[in-house]
Amino acid sequence: MIDTIAALSTAQGPGAIGILRVSGSLVMPIALAVLEKNQKPLTETFLQNQKRSAIFCDFVENGKPLDQIVFFYFPAPNSYTGEDLAEFHLHGNPLLLKRALHVLFEKGARPAQKGEFTKRAYMNGKINLSGAEAISRLIEARSKYELELAQKNVFGEITKLSSKIRSDLISLKAECEAEIDFSTEDLTFESLEERKNRMVALKNLCSKLIKDSERAESYILQSTVVLYGEPNTGKSSLMNLLIGKDRSIISDVPGTTRDYIAEELSLDGIPIRLVDTAGIRDTTDNIEQMGIERSKREADSANVKLFLIDTSLPFEKQSFLLKHKDRLFGSLIVANKIDSKHPSWHTESIHDIQEEFQLTISEISCKTKQGIPELLELLKSKLTSKDDTEDLVLLEDRQRYHIQKIESCLSEAIQLMENNAPAEIYIQEINVALHEIGQVNGVVENEEILGRIFSKFCVGK
């Protein structure tokens, strides 16, 4: 008998609907014990005839209706877990859901562990390990790019690629074994050059997969964008404008921002940590100076530095360069306050700086919001300098480890072939590579590894 598990499958907190999921051998007895329709208990025959259909009925506790619900019954093996599975769709009041879940426990279910439903799906062959990890990534995705990459894996991109690698490895192994076993027979085998070329192509596929995954990783890692510059250039105003709330104090008094302030936001699906820093200036105030030093460290470690300058002040090229030359390199220059631009800030002066230092300059006004959409597009291109995610694939750390091992095995096998080693020697590397590719999709016997993977899930998944 398979023990029966139950858990809340929707998010914690109030909502229109809350779903309780139950899986295991006691699904039918539990359902019959807690469901009524027109004040009459449901029958097993009725539920079997209504499988995979929505049944409107009452959920009862101690013979009294607790809630009007929609019930779904999915008999094995045609369910998410591969076991008998049921879903109770109740109104999404947390107290109501807690009481209903307690009733299910009283009738023989036990609380599910994190990821246990998906683990059962894996153990029953409904999904492979790559698919399970993709579901976890899909649920936890924090950005548009991560969601797109997770969706590709849910629909089997990793499985397809690893299946190709496995198929090619089996083909190589079969050719090597045939040569070893039938070397005295009058048979024709592929040339060593052809075999080596196949290994090189397979190794290159693994290398590309790893590199593509590293590129994909850059899409989903949070980027740090630092607003940097002298006091009163509009850093705090731009910070508040970009995050849509008054997070930084705005004042005409220099030195108002004494320390850096960080906020998280999403720029068209790109996760960003936006940092407003203390204005850079010479000061005798020790506390302000400490804030300036911390701001410089933040700027040095940023993915993108937005160096703000105040165009309402007079511009003189030589003094400007003398003051800011070291800060310009590696920065995206944001020329703020163009709504009140000083006459000395004519177009040629900006172009001169742009050409001399090969800089990108964005002209904006935080006051009128002029140039803000263009700045955001420029920032997005700086952060991504990315292509579309269409040709990329995202490997989990565990998967990447095994693909790297395969790449290493193939490199070793190629080296052995070039040194005229017999097939009996380099076939061992192919055998190890085959073991590693099995680990990618789920030929994993280690319970500790499985536990680590599925513990990342929420309880109801």
From Swiss-Prot:
Q: Where in the cell does this protein reside?
A: Cytoplasm
Stated family:
Belongs to the TRAFAC class TrmE-Era-EngA-EngB-Septin-like GTPase superfamily. TrmE GTPase family.
Which sites bind K(+)? 232, 251, 253, 256
Which GO biological process entries does UniProt record here?
tRNA methylation; tRNA wobble uridine modification
The gene for this chain is mnmE
- Where is the organism placed in the taxonomic lineage, from the top? Bacteria, Pseudomonadati, Spirochaetota, Spirochaetia, Leptospirales
**Which Pfam families does the entry mention?**
MMR_HSR1, MnmE_helical, TrmE_N
Query: What sequence ranges are listed for the domain TrmE-type G?
Result: 222-384
Name the needed cofactors. Answer: K(+)
UniProt-recorded name of the protein: tRNA modification GTPase MnmE
Q: Where does (6S)-5-formyl-5,6,7,8-tetrahydrofolate bind?
A: 21, 87, 126, 461
Cofactor, free-text remark: Binds 1 potassium ion per subunit.
